[in-house]
């Protein structure tokens, strides 16, 4: 669910998901559109694709089980929403790995976005 997702982002990056990642670029936030080309936006594009491939969890706002082990997110092994958890984990880690490239000028990006990336 969004709260769990936000907690993963906060713990991995030290940044609150809002406003840092909610409106950044063209794929981040609700209803991502087309690629801006930033690394954070690429993380969001991959996350959107991950959600499209989910099979075990009916809705992307369902709760899942996870824990932290040695500073690593561990998704619940027997959880029917494990795939959803793995998608959220992947983007939180991607944001952390790209912290040095975060550019707040794209935080409230209102200009038209570039041509869409290849389909998932």
Curated annotation (Swiss-Prot):
Biological process per Gene Ontology, one example term: lipid catabolic process
Q: Where in the cell is it found?
A: Secreted
Which residues does UniProt assign to the signal peptide?
A: none
Where is the site labelled Hydrophobic membrane-disruption site (MDiS)?
110
Provide the residue span(s) of the region labelled Important for membrane-damaging activities in eukaryotes and bacteria.
104-115
Tissues expressing the protein: Expressed by the venom gland.
Tell me which residues are marked as the site Cationic membrane-docking site (MDoS). 111
Record-annotated site: Putative cationic membrane-docking site (MDoS): 63
Q: Which family does it belong to?
A: Belongs to the phospholipase A2 family. Group II subfamily. D49 sub-subfamily.
Q: What is this protein called?
A: Basic phospholipase A2 homolog piratoxin-3
């Amino acid at each position: 669910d969004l709260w769990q997702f936000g907690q993963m982002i906060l713990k991995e990056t030290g940044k609150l998901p809002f406003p840092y990642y909610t409106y950044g670029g063209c794929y981040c936030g609700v209803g991502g559109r087309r690629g801006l080309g930033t690394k954070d936006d690429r993380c969001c594009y991959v996350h959107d694709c991950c959600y499209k491939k989910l099979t075990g969890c009916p809705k992307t706002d369902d709760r899942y089980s996870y824990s932290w082990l040695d500073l690593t997110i561990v998704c619940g092994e027997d959880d029917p929403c494990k795939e959803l958890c793995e998608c959220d984990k992947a983007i939180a880690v991607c944001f952390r790995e790209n912290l040095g490239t975060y550019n707040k000028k794209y935080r409230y990006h209102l200009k038209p976005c570039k041509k869409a990336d290849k389909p998932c």
